[in-house]
Amino acid sequence: MEEPRKTTRSAKPANESGSAKAVKPLTIFVDGEFVPEEDAKVSVFDHGLLYGDGIFEGIRFYNGRVFRLEEHLDRLWDSARSICLDLPMSRSEMTEAVLETIRKNDLRDGYIRLIVTRGVGNLGLNPTQCKRPSVIIIATTIALYSKEMYQNGLTVVTVATRRTGPGALNPAVKSLNYLNNVMARIEANLAEADEALMLNDQGCIAECTAEALRGITRSIVFEIAAELGIKISEVDISRHDVFIADECLLSGTAAEVIPVVKADGRVIGTGKPGPISLRMIARFREITREGGTPIYS
């Protein structure tokens, strides 16, 4: 799950001395310039706004290092190629822009939203009218779920909104068009559940509200499972499989790794985060602190 439901700006110190630092307005990267957040604007004719025509990546950074940056950029470039979007920056320029955005905001731990829109065009749908894509980079802190939710687990509810099929929009593209996910989120809110469980047209579980692509956090969970000697099987699953599971967890860049303890009102396992989930979470947090692209070097 890559989509933050709640974003906060932390008043915790960004330096290592422990001294308090006042919360200050964000500095945003917009098309090669760093501007105060109140001046970070896009045109009303940008096709990212008009049609959701664009792509994005959500990227975490921990302890002064950007986590799996190269993998996120690989996915960004793949998404761009898939939708015939010519990125206006080189790989090295994009990397430096991400790092400098974090530096401008004096952060060591947080979340990056890297956005590329089709750019300014007219009110027509034709993307050839957009002469140059727009790049926006936001660095901030994030709290998708509370500490208590990570300790106690989430509740999920199956929603009526079906996940958009790959024949309509390939899930490998991390598109700006998230209305399908938003509608599922609304259903979860109305049901007073923490997350929505989405099904595909065959009735198999597709995802929750924020992830349906080659998940980078998901791949790390697979790596951890291999370390722990846990067999991974990738198969289609239904609600039945969730109901009878001993443990269940969700993964995503913003959410990281978090247990699920109840689905559609039915308790999963003991109703508490299980031992495998807890080991996964602990190891994931270790890995995020072990490496990454240095921000301040």
What is the predicted function of each stretch?
Residues 204-211:
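Short, intrinsically disordered, charge-balanced linker/junction segments flanking boundaries
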Residues 1-195, 201-204, 222-297:
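Conserved alpha/beta cores of soluble small-molecule-handling proteins
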Residues 212-225:
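Gly/Ser/Thr-rich active-site loops/lids in small-molecule metabolic enzymes
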